[in-house]
Amino acid sequence: MARATNLNAAPSAGASGPPDSLPSTLAPPSPGSPAALPRASTPCGLSGFSGLNIRSTSSMLTKPLQGHPSPPVTPTQPPGGKDRAAFEAEYRLGPLLGKGGFGTVFAGHRVTDRRQVAIKVISRNRVLGWSTVSDSVTCPLEVALLWKVGEGNGHPGVIRLLDWFETPEGFMLVLERPMPAQDLFDYITEKGPLGESCSRSFFTQVVAAVQHCHARGVVHRDIKDENILIDLCRGSIKLIDFGSGALLHDEPYTDFDGTRVYSPPEWISRHQYHALPATVWSLGVLLYDMVCGDIPFERDQEILEAELHFPAHVSPDCCALIRRCLAPKPCSRPSLEEILLDPWMQSPAEEKPINSSKGSPTPLPWSLLP
């Protein structure tokens, strides 16, 4: 399938040129955006959308990079966004990494130690939600959510907001940038279906990252392969792009800015959903994508029917977990804790060979097994 797009993000026709909110004095030369790699010729079945989907904004920081992993740095969120002069003194903007409906992402580095970062630039008129962080300081909701999940030591599986700045035109979010790294969409596109040991490792880390977010009162609402960043040196993952996220609550949500092919049937049929079962549904789609090499559903009717077909190489235990996560009724889906206790998660089985046109996945350069 083609790379999917957030429902309400107006895709850009291209990634060249500076963003609307970035002053020309800061705009670097624009090399253009890396092309999205389609997995199949059939476009995603998004209602009211046709043509090839463009990758989501924050996943642009996942362009494969060369270099050595950077040491962890504690995020430093000021009570209010600093201004343009402070940004120019503290950071240098690098090449354009990509452009999407909610903003533009550049490479960059911090002046003091040349630490590589990603700089997400958001136009003020494209901010969908606002929040108050402290002392009545108003900021984009995405900043507040990243702050909440990054407070204290944060979590190794969640991207860190290092800094943020406010200009008359919009906002600049400075995010950590593991190097070298690749998003899970590109990784699967390159490797084909992943082995179950690799999938189990990635999936366990994603579930743990989601648990951390929920413990901090944040629901991501756009869990998908494009928003999973793989540190290619360590074999660890990070959950990125909180632009569709929200504060976690028990009441049903009636808005959704995530990716439709990962959305649950209750949203398709009733335009409402609860955070926890909807999250588990998207995790089921993600796990299917990892072990099968593509997502299970492309059109609304397929989501509603939830009919699953598995290649022969996928083990019965893995199939069973995916079926549990993709149960049509929200009340029938497991909790995050129950997912981690599932037999497939607890008892790795010997894998069957994968017959793929791309060949079996290349052995990873890091230890994934307990």
From Swiss-Prot:
Alphabetically, the GO molecular function entries are: ATP binding; protein kinase activity; protein serine kinase activity; protein serine/threonine kinase activity
Which keywords does UniProt give here? Apoptosis, ATP-binding, Cell cycle, Kinase, Nucleotide-binding, Phosphoprotein, Proto-oncogene, Serine/threonine-protein kinase, Transferase
Protein kinase domain location: 91-345
Which residue intervals are annotated with compositional bias (Pro residues) in the record? 69-78
Reaction catalysed? L-seryl-[protein] + ATP = O-phospho-L-seryl-[protein] + ADP + H(+); L-threonyl-[protein] + ATP = O-phospho-L-threonyl-[protein] + ADP + H(+)
Spell out the catalytic residues.
Answer: D222 (proton acceptor)
> Known SUPFAM superfamilies for this protein?
Protein kinase-like (PK-like)
Q: How is it modified after translation?
A: Autophosphorylated.
Q: Does the keyword Cell cycle apply?
A: yes
Q: What is its EC number?
A: 2.7.11.1
Q: Which InterPro entries match?
A: Kinase-like_dom_sf, PIM_Ser/Thr_kinase, Prot_kinase_dom, Protein_kinase_ATP_BS, Ser/Thr_kinase_AS
Q: Which GO terms describe its biological process?
A: apoptotic mitochondrial changes; apoptotic process; G1/S transition of mitotic cell cycle; macroautophagy; negative regulation of apoptotic process; negative regulation of cell population proliferation; positive regulation of autophagy; positive regulation of canonical NF-kappaB signal transduction
Where is the stretch described as Disordered?
1-42, 61-83, 349-370
Compositionally biased, Low complexity: which spans? 1-25
- Indicate yes or no for the key word Cell cycle: yes
Tissue expression: Widely expressed, with highest expression in spleen, thymus and brain. Expressed in epiphyseal chondrocytes.
Q: What induces it?
A: Induced by a wide range of growth factors and mitogens; IL2, IL3, IL4, IL7,IL9 and by interferon-gamma (IFNG).
Looking at its record, which EC class is this enzyme?
Answer: transferase
List the Pfam families: Pkinase (PF00069)
Q: What domain of life is recorded for the organism?
A: Eukaryota
Q: Which family does it belong to?
A: Belongs to the protein kinase superfamily. CAMK Ser/Thr protein kinase family. PIM subfamily.
Subunit annotation? Interacts with MYC.
Q: So what does this one do?
A: Proto-oncogene with serine/threonine kinase activity involved in cell survival and cell proliferation. Exerts its oncogenic activity through: the regulation of MYC transcriptional activity, the regulation of cell cycle progression, the regulation of cap-dependent protein translation and through survival signaling by phosphorylation of a pro-apoptotic protein, BAD. Phosphorylation of MYC leads to an increase of MYC protein stability and thereby an increase of transcriptional activity.
This protein is called what?
A: Serine/threonine-protein kinase pim-2
